[in-house]
Amino acid sequence: MSSRYRTLLGHLLLAVGSTAGFVLLIELAAKVAGLPLGAPLLPDSRNCLQRSSLLSMEFRPHCHGALSFAAFDTNDLGLRSPEVRDDGSRRILAIGDSCTWGWAVPQDGSYPAVLQRLLDQRSDGTRYQVINAGTPGYTSYHGLQYLRERGLALHPFILILGYGFNDATTDGDVEEQLAAERRLLPVMLVDDFLFLHSRAYAFARRHSMAARRDPRQRVDPARFGQHLEEMITLARADGVHTMALSFSATQQGPYGEALASVATQLAIPVVTYQGPRFDVVHPTAEGYGALAALILERLEHEGWVE
């Protein structure tokens, strides 16, 4: 090796060593200062979340975790649901946000789980399989992507839509965010690792995000209506019956109007939940049970459940 290359290599090693030492010094200072590590997107669920090029974040298959005071388990599809059976039963696919997933209730307390028990108690001989494909934080845009790429592949007989609250939250346009994440997925994975393991990086990222928070709604009311219409149209093309859920506490104003307009235009039933809530958004355990009963009543009224 020539003296020139030895000199360059020495300079490179010196630069790397100096940078590493500087980073370690900053990290030590952050630890002494008591700065916390970054928290996962959903607290207590760090080991069960993974990046997704389709949906940004999703739950890992076969994972046991805890979220909002309640334990959960995922099946081989990463859903909070029993394993999907191929036994000829009629499948009811419930897609939505945390109100579908079952926020703050045990595994058997979500409305899809309660609906399954109510259907199992019937004696007409028809077998039904309710699949809980809800995910906390998801918007109607996530629902459309999921239905198109995965949901319809499950061959549901009935589809239940439950979106709206997360669409209305202000954190920037979700379609733009997902497009950027797809382009930069390796960078996002490194970002996640550093956020969860470096106090200095977590501190810098928090302040950076706060300074550039996007005030736009994740999905505006017009596109919310378009997403609903696209999901219903996709389902109908496959011969799937569709209904929608409305949570009156979170779907007043333009989002509720968009849902009502699409429901009228495409003639789909809407079940409105007005029962007790755990917080501003989510039903209580008793509320999920009442919602499941309302859904079953409407399914019977439509003639979709015999």
Give the positions of each predicted feature.
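A conserved hydrophobic secondary-structure block that centers on an alpha-helix together
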Residues: T126-L144, E149
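Serine-dependent acyl-ester chemistry module
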Residues: G164-S261, Q265-V281, L296
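Histidine-centered active-site loop/cap adjacent to the catalytic His
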Residues: L14, D279-E306
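Short, amphipathic alpha-helical "lid/cap" segments that border enzyme active or binding sites
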Residues: S140, L144, P221, G225, ...
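Hydrophobic membrane-insertion alpha-helices, especially the h-region
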Residues: L13-A29
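Conserved beta-strand elements of the Class I
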Residues: R91-I95, I131, L159-L161
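Proline-aspartate-enriched helix->loop->beta-strand connector
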Residues: G151, H155-I160
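Membrane/wall-proximal cationic-aromatic binding patches
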Residues: A33-L118, R122-S123
